[in-house]
Amino acid sequence: MFLSFCGVDTRMNFTDHLYTALKQKSIITFRDDEKLEQGKYISPELLKAIKESKYAIIILSINYAFSKCLIELAKIVECMKKSRLTVLPVFYHVDPSDVRNQRGTFTEAFAKHEEDTKVNTKDVQAWKAALRDVGHIAGWHVHDR
């Protein structure tokens, strides 16, 4: 099981509880370490964990599209299409249609990525496509605070 999430939004609450529950059920679960260097790239170990997982839970939250999670997401969707990785989206305080149609904070995030000269335009297009794909998958909508 691979967990993809934006640490600032969910690491210390929803994701931590989910990770603990999965471990208690003896489900081998991989999540990134908050001590990992934050940046525009993800480690080869993280990519390997995605490729070797049978399931991925994607916790889409307000700041998800501002984070390096988009790189994870593109790899997850690629694996979903190629190797039968099962994807389970959780829409955490975001509307699934905003994810699908990239409205709200998703619009803001992509505007920021498109302005960043260090970010490849093809990568941004891949991230948008991956978000659209995941936004069309039936998932769990968490909207109560």
Write out the residue ranges for each language-model feature.
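Cross-kingdom TIR/SEFIR domain
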Residues: 20-24, 42-144
